[in-house]
């Protein structure tokens, strides 16, 4: 910095003063999620299960889940039981509900939401509750790429909102869950 601003030694001094005033202790290895409390008073895990089975029924009715000999109802139910078990065991029912909440809200107010991408598309539960629109059974996608007991880092859903209404979706999350529980993360790809 001294090389960039040789005529302004106060810039270096002021930068050092600002750095000295900054104090934040990061707690690594701890996940800090807001709480999701279903309005109906159900426990989060039970509510996620209800949404999942309601979603299965709705998707069968609207034709986005087609039951046949390769994928009968019991195959869907078995996968649901497995996923809900892992989600519950790892303590992520509220995480699913938070993502469901803001995706559901966006769709309700007409904000276009992408169909899903990344490893989150491997979750049948995510499909059935409307976080994604990709049937992981039909496309042989692995739930374990998204969430498994050996995974040490928190999973994340890649959610795409329409660029000109994205701010509305983010404002909803900030308002409902608080500024201190809201962040935006983006990766920029380059050809370099």
What would you call each of these model-derived segments?
Residues 1-192:
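Phosphodiester-processing cores and adjacent nucleic acid-binding clamps
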